[in-house]
C-alpha cells in the first residue's frame, strides 16, 4: 500500500512539474539578458551614446524583480498585452536583480518600470504599476500611431 501511494505521489509531482514547465514555455513576454538585449534591442557597446533600436517591431520592456509585489501584478497584464498585440509589438522583460547593467543604462530606480520603444525616435518610460487600460493607451499612442 505504501509503495503504491509513493508511486502515485511521484507521478503527480512529475505531472505538476511538467505542467509548470509548459506554462513557462508558453510565455509571450520574452526574458532578456544583456547579450540578447544587445542583439535584439540596442548595441550599447558599439553605440553607447545614441539609442538605435534594432528591432523589427515596436517593443515594450518590463523592468521587474521577482520580490516586487507591483511587478507581480503587472506580469499577467504584460502577458495579456503580448497576446493582444502579437505580430505588432514585441514584449520583453528584464530582471533588474540579474541584469544590473541594463537597469543602470535606463536609470531604473523604481520598479516596475516599463520602457516603450517606437520604431523611430527615443523610448519613453513609465514608472509604477498601471492598469491594463493605461498600458493599452500608452501602446496605442506611443508605439502604433
Whereabouts are the PLM-identified features?
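N-terminal targeting signals for export/organelle localization
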Residues: 1-38, 145
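Non-catalytic, surface beta->alpha helical segment in thiol-disulfide oxidoreductase systems
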Residues: 110, 115-145
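Short pre-active-site segment immediately N-terminal to redox-active cysteine/selenocysteine motifs
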Residues: 56-59, 63-67, 110
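Loop/turn elements at helix/coil->beta-strand transitions in domains of secreted/extracellular proteins
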Residues: 56-59, 87-90, 119
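Structural micro-motif
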Residues: 58, 100, 106-115
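A short beta-strand-turn-helix
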Residues: 32-57
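C-type cytochrome heme c attachment motif
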Residues: 66-73, 113
